Amino acid sequence: MQRYPTKQIKIRDVLIGGDAPISVQSMTFSKTKDVKGTLEQIQRLYFAGCDIVRCAVFDKEDASALKQIVAGSPIPVVADIHFNHTYALIVSEFVDAIRINPGNIGSAKNIKAVVDACKQRNLPIRIGVNSGSLEKRFEDRYGRTVEAMVESALYNIKLLEDFDFTDIKISLKSSDVERTMQAYRALRPKTNYPFHLGVTEAGTAFHATIKSAIALGGLLLEGIGDTMRVSITGELEEEIKVAKAILKDSGRQKEGLNIISCPTCGRLQADLMAAVKLVEEKTKDIKEPLNVSVMGCVVNAIGEAKGADVAIAFGKGNGMIMRHGEVVARLPESELVDRFLQEIDDEIKSRG
């Protein structure tokens, strides 16, 4: 499905919305006032493929530290503001964007002050609605529901527009997968601002991966979403790895290998798991979009090979390598993976 057409905004040099690629975001978990530690985490995220990073602003020390952090960051830095809008006024002089939580940022007067500061440097604002911290009037009326989240977003969109501000992106996060998806679906036809997708408080790697794959992957398949974060407790690189995989497997990012491998069964006569792990490790940095197949026997190998750029099928002590469905080599098992990797390299080179 085609993506919903959205307004395009810019965070430093990263475009969000419109026809821009869907960007991947994350958040540091160091104390932001620890400049060295925070920059180390940002570097890790950058090398993992993160496009935008967010840093918490808990106090004035955090706010002041962001000046050095932004100067040393290779990717755009978003200040995450809760409760005290004056921190947004401080950081607006040097960060690349600001996220506010309408549930705790305070009065319209406070928001106007933030908007006025952002206008000075053309900084985008993310309206970050969270089902766990909704404005009292919306929670009292609707409870912690999809309706409350959508009404909060619409109210704050209009508020910013009334202040003549339209460099906006929106998020509607919940720890509940279904509520998250329903909120984004409900708001999408009512505004053309870009959406930041995420499931908040998603948990540790296993649970967060499943929740995010369902919610974010499902929304992406419906054409919803312009930027995203996979939230994983205590992880950095893993957030980016999972987000990139969701983008690739939803068809929204044409980059890297799509590795097809069988789940194994009683017909297996080779160490397929070791072979797949080795292929994954050796090809993890490849950017060329390729379909490769690693199969344990010939039952499905021939069929999968027809749809693969490069394929390998193991047998008993031997196997075969295929390119675009055609057998190019039959070799002993000990030589198969090395030849397979060589064929992948050759396929990439053949594309120029």
From Swiss-Prot:
GO aspect biological process, one term: terpenoid biosynthetic process
Catalysed reactions, semicolon-separated: (2E)-4-hydroxy-3-methylbut-2-enyl diphosphate + oxidized [flavodoxin] + H2O + 2 H(+) = 2-C-methyl-D-erythritol 2,4-cyclic diphosphate + reduced [flavodoxin]
Source species, domain of life: Bacteria
Free-text remark on how the cofactor is bound: Binds 1 [4Fe-4S] cluster.
MF terms (GO), sorted A to Z: 4 iron, 4 sulfur cluster binding; 4-hydroxy-3-methylbut-2-en-1-yl diphosphate synthase activity (ferredoxin); 4-hydroxy-3-methylbut-2-enyl-diphosphate synthase activity (flavodoxin); iron ion binding
Cofactor(s) in the UniProt record: [4Fe-4S] cluster
Pfam families: GcpE (PF04551)
Broad class of enzyme this protein falls into: oxidoreductase
Residue numbers binding [4Fe-4S] cluster: C262, C265, C297, E304
Record keywords, A-Z: 4Fe-4S, Iron, Iron-sulfur, Isoprene biosynthesis, Metal-binding, Oxidoreductase
Pathway field: Isoprenoid biosynthesis; isopentenyl diphosphate biosynthesis via DXP pathway; isopentenyl diphosphate from 1-deoxy-D-xylulose 5-phosphate: step 5/6
The keyword Metal-binding belongs to this UniProt entry's keyword annotation: yes
EC numbers, comma separated: 1.17.7.3
Biological role stated in the UniProt entry: Converts 2C-methyl-D-erythritol 2,4-cyclodiphosphate (ME-2,4cPP) into 1-hydroxy-2-methyl-2-(E)-butenyl 4-diphosphate.
Family (UniProt): Belongs to the IspG family.
PANTHER family named in the record: 4-HYDROXY-3-METHYLBUT-2-EN-1-YL DIPHOSPHATE SYNTHASE, 4-HYDROXY-3-METHYLBUT-2-EN-1-YL DIPHOSPHATE SYNTHASE (FERREDOXIN), CHLOROPLASTIC
Protein name in the entry: 4-hydroxy-3-methylbut-2-en-1-yl diphosphate synthase (flavodoxin)
Natural source organism: Campylobacter concisus (strain 13826)
Species classification: Bacteria, Pseudomonadati, Campylobacterota, Epsilonproteobacteria, Campylobacterales
